[in-house]
C-alpha cells in the first residue's frame, strides 16, 4: 500500500515501514561513525522500540557490539492499517543486527506485567545467562499494577492552581494561551503509579532474585527536569512528582544491588520531540525555540546523539560516573546552559503566531514529529508501494 501521514491532534495514526527503517539505519550509522565504546556486553532495554529506549538499544549493539533483549508493546499491521512505528523500528533493528552478526531478541507485551518480566528473565537465563546493563525507558500513559490489579492513568496537570501560558499548534503555527486546570490528589497518585519508579523497582527485584544481573551491573532510567518556563506543567506538576519518585527509586534500587556490586542511576536527558512531549501543552513551543537556539550554537542533539554521549562520556569512560548533588547523570547540560536558557526566555517573550516561523524552529519540530512515524525522512520514496505486513525477526 501507499502510506501517507494521517493526523488526529497530536497523534499520527499511520506509520511508514521504509521511513522507520531509514531512521534506524541513520541512527546506527551515527553510532558507528563515533567509534567503539568500551561499554556493556549484554543488555536488557525495557521500552526498546522508540525514542531514548531505541537509541539505547542501537548504541549498545552498534557502539559496543552488545547482545540486546528489547521489551516493548507495539502493534503489527492489521487489515489495511499500518503497524505502529515501534513495530517497524524493531523490524529494522533486528534485521540490521542480524546482518552484523549481533545477538538481538525481542519480547512484545505489557512490561508492567509479571508474565512479561518472567518471560524476559527466562530468555536471559537461556540465551545470555546474565546482563550487565538494564535500561528502563517506558513511556506509557496507563499501567495496571500486577500486585493490586488496579489500573492507573497518568495525567499532565499543574499542582496547586491553574496554569496559563503560551502554546503552539505545531501543525498550523497558531500561538495561543492555554489554561490547564490543576490536579487533585488522585491525579498525582495515579501519575506517580504509572510514571514513577515502582515498576523499575519490580523489574530489578525480579532480576536480582532470579540471579540474572551480572556483578557490577548498572541500571539507568531516563528523566527530565527542564527550565522554569515549563516547570508548572512539567517538573512541579504531576509528571514532576512521578520523576521525583523515579529519581528516589534509584537510591532504593542501588541499596538492593549491593549484593552484586551494582548501581542504579537516573539520567536527566534534554527536551526532544516525542509522541509524549507533543501532547503536553507549552512544551512544543518551548522545544521549537530551544531547537532554534541550540542549532544556532551547533549543540543540537536528537535521541541518538544524546544516548551515544551518555555512553561514551558518562557511563563508560573507565572513570567514576559524574553526577549532580542528587546523584543524577546530567546530559541535559547543553540545554540548561545559562546562555541557551536566557536566549530561549527572551524569544518566549516575543513569540506570536505572526513571527513563530521566523524566531523558532517550528519547521524542525514538525519534521522531527513526522520522523517519529517514518515520514519526512530523506532518501525515502513515499509514492512507492510498500509492504506494511512485516514480521519482527527474533520475536520471542
Swiss-Prot record:
Recorded E.C. number(s)? 1.3.1.9
Q: Where is the active site?
A: 234 (proton donor)
Residues of the site described as Plays an important role in discriminating NADH against NADPH: 74
Q: Which residues cross the membrane?
A: none
Which UniProt keywords are listed? Fatty acid biosynthesis, Fatty acid metabolism, Lipid biosynthesis, Lipid metabolism, NAD, Oxidoreductase
Q: Which GO terms describe its molecular function?
A: enoyl-[acyl-carrier-protein] reductase (NADH) activity; NAD binding; trans-2-enoyl-CoA reductase (NADH) activity
Q: Which InterPro entries match?
A: Eno_Rdtase_FAD-bd_dom, Enoyl-CoA_Rdtase_cat_dom, FabV-like_NADH_b, Trans-2-enoyl-CoA_reductase
| Example GO BP | fatty acid biosynthetic process
Q: Reply yes or no: does the keyword Ribosomal protein apply.
A: no
Q: Which cysteines are joined by disulfide bonds?
A: none
Give the top-rank taxon of the lineage listed in the UniProt record for this protein. Answer: Bacteria
Q: Its pathway?
A: Lipid metabolism; fatty acid biosynthesis
Which annotated residues bind substrate? Answer: 224
Positions bound to NAD(+): 47-52, 73-74, 110-111, 138-139, 243, 272-274
Carries keyword Lipid metabolism? yes
Q: Which reaction does it catalyse?
A: a 2,3-saturated acyl-[ACP] + NAD(+) = a (2E)-enoyl-[ACP] + NADH + H(+)
> What this chain does, per the record?
Involved in the final reduction of the elongation cycle of fatty acid synthesis (FAS II). Catalyzes the reduction of a carbon-carbon double bond in an enoyl moiety that is covalently linked to an acyl carrier protein (ACP).
Q: How does it assemble?
A: Monomer.
Identify its protein family: Belongs to the TER reductase family.
Q: What is this protein called?
A: Enoyl-[acyl-carrier-protein] reductase [NADH]
State the organism named in the record. Cytophaga hutchinsonii (strain ATCC 33406 / DSM 1761 / CIP 103989 / NBRC 15051 / NCIMB 9469 / D465)
